[in-house]
Design a protein with these regions (language model features):
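Non-catalytic accessory regions flanking glycosidase/transglycosidase catalytic cores in CAZymes
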Residues: 1-144
Length: 144
């Protein structure tokens, strides 16, 4: 392994931030029983970017109720034009907390892979046009 060395007597200019995360900070704002929070440390780290890939497996963000299309739109037989068909609660909170900590979010629009024996939500949709409408409404929600 190579060692990165600097001559501190020379000026090199600004360093590009290289730190980023998958998932934002843990915050106790709405989860008072949460054992721990890393919000202040996360904010102090000044992390420029975070993505929310496969966060449905992390209970701290809402577990099976956040980020995946099947979590945000849990009943595929529901009307995709009815705002009541969508559950943005946990996903909104994770994104809001991340933004409040000063971190920009890369939103992953998709579905968490299921490596278990039984698959529940990783099958192709039964109606691709409806799936596209659902995706469109999720994108619109986060680009208001």
């Amino acid at each position: 392994m190579e060692t990165l060395q600097f001559d501190l007597t020379k000026e090199y200019g600004k360093f590009k931030p290289l730190n980023a995360t998958n998932g934002g900070p843990w915050h106790k704002r709405f989860t008072k029983k949460m054992v721990r929070s890393n919000y202040e440390e996360y904010k102090a780290a000044r992390i420029p970017y975070s993505r929310n890939h496969d966060l449905a497996v992390h209970t701290v963000y809402g577990g099976p109720y956040c980020h995946d299309i099947s979590c945000i739109f849990p009943n595929f037989d529901a009307n995709p034009y009815d705002p009541k068909s969508y559950d943005f609660g946990c996903t909104d909170e994770e994104i809001l907390t991340t933004l409040e900590a000063g971190t920009k979010t890369f939103f992953r629009l998709g579905q968490t892979i299921e490596n278990q024996i039984v698959k529940h939500n990783t099958f192709p949709p039964k109606d691709f046009k409806k799936w596209a409408v659902i995706c469109e409404h999720i994108i619109r929600h986060y680009n208001y």
